[in-house]
Amino acid sequence: MSEAAQLRRGLKPKGKTYGLTNQKRREIREIFDLFDIDGSGSIDASELNVAMRSLGFEMNNQQINELMAEVDKNQSGAIDFDEFVHMMTTKFGERDSIDELSKAFKIIDHDNNGKISPRDIKMIAKELGENFTDNDIEEMIEEADRDKDGEVNLEEFMKMMKRTSYG
């Protein structure tokens, strides 16, 4: 059984726990899977760039590369789940204020209609030089879309992003 399947079933996760409850670790896994666009089980520099911008952090390529070097302890060229957990709990846990999350939401909500649509994600991906498939975008929306209307409103976005606030 894959770790993702174990987490969905509520079994004890493998790897370092950083003092997190199983529930919080599952929530971080959900965010990790959202940003692991290619499903490789790790986040490369390109995916990290998308993740940081989505979280409201405007970072240039040099800053992304520096963050990768700092977080990628095994120097694999990508951030695995344990490294992501460490980054989220030690580096960015305290950064998820309501103002910062609202700013991130507004950046992604290109048409300013109060919802993040597949079109909004396509537009920000284009700005970032990313090329997501429609399936990738659909999966991103489904991760946060609690009312199942096909878009992510501010409340849904806040709930999803606040689940990564452990600092």
UniProtKB/Swiss-Prot annotation:
GO BP annotations listed? DNA repair
List ligand-binding residues for Ca(2+) 1.
D36, D38, S40, S42, E47
Q: Which UniProt keywords apply?
A: Calcium, Cytoplasm, DNA damage, DNA repair, Metal-binding, Nucleus, Repeat
* UniProt xrefs under InterPro entries: CALM/Myosin/TropC-like, EF-hand-dom_pair, EF_Hand_1_Ca_BS, EF_hand_dom
Q: Name one GO cellular component term.
A: nucleus
> Which residues are listed for Ca(2+) 2 binding in this entry?
D72, N74, S76, E83
Q: How is the subunit organization of this protein annotated in UniProt?
A: Interacts with RAD4. Calcium is required for this interaction. Interacts with SAC3B.
Provide the protein name.
Calcium-binding protein CML19
Q: Which organism is it from?
A: Arabidopsis thaliana (Mouse-ear cress)
Which lineage? Eukaryota, Viridiplantae, Streptophyta, Embryophyta, Tracheophyta
